Structures are given as C-alpha cells and as structure tokens.
C-alpha cells in the first residue's frame, strides 16, 4: 500500500575554501535535514511534505498513514519557526567562513538538545492521487511564555492515527511539580 517515512536530502559533494586558506576542501552538504515523504503503492509517485516554515530547509516527518473515504490522512510533524536564541546561534556560527552554511546548520541542530526548530504535530490530508488537500497543525501540550519561546525550541509530534481519526504522539509539557521543568510526554490530539 501507500507508505510514509522521512529522510535527509541527498548529499552533494562540494568544494569549499575556508576563509584564510588557499586550498579547497571537500565537503558534503544537503538542502534540508529531514523531510517527510508519501510514496504510492507501486513506487511511481512520491510526494515530499515540505514544511510551511522552510528556512534553512526546515524539517518534516511523516510517521503514519491511514486510508480514508476520500484519500489518505498522514500524521507527523513539521518545523514552524526558529526561536530567537537559536537564530542568534546560527547568525554567530554559520557565516559560511569555516564550513558551508548547511553543514553548520546540521551540526548545530545535532548538538542542541531540542534542535534548532520549533516543530508541531501536523495532519496532512491527501486525495486518491496523493495531492495534498489540507495541512492542519495539531498544537502542543503547553504554551511557552515569551522568554521560553525566545530561548528554546519546543516540539510536538503525531506518531499514529487510527480509523476513527484519533491521533496520538508526544509533546513538550510542564512537569506538574515545577513549571520551569519541561518534559516530553505522551499525548493525544483532539480538535488541534
């Protein structure tokens, strides 16, 4: 049947000369860190689930799919923004002087506990021909205060959907004994 998943962009071999150096170095770069994809049963059609926020490539994941009366429902997550503090990290470090910008973005994303991007659980609706007909952001189990939203990335993700449309996943939320402690807990999404 129709399947979903995600992967990185293909890597390109590029020649890059760091500032202050005379000799070019070989680097491997890619356009985005991860992208969700839907693939038809016979493999002849593939649909990338590009995030609405795609600066530095953005991110998306497709975790589950179900057949519906009018097509398919796919759930996962996608990037929605970059917090100010993370953007400052990018501006300070990813200047295309020591390494290609995309390499720096990938390293920063890997080295920061919650990554560079704010990500939200999402539901995509596709028709029988795998055309995307709607994209619905499903929300998160907490509302970050202004300071938190500037400093940290927050994530929710939809992991599975059943035939009744119930969507389950995980979300950052506050620890009940201490509002300053952010945890990731299992959730279900109802009405976004």
Where do the PLM segments sit?
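Residue-level hotspots at or immediately adjacent to binding/recognition sites across diverse folds
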Residues: 1-192
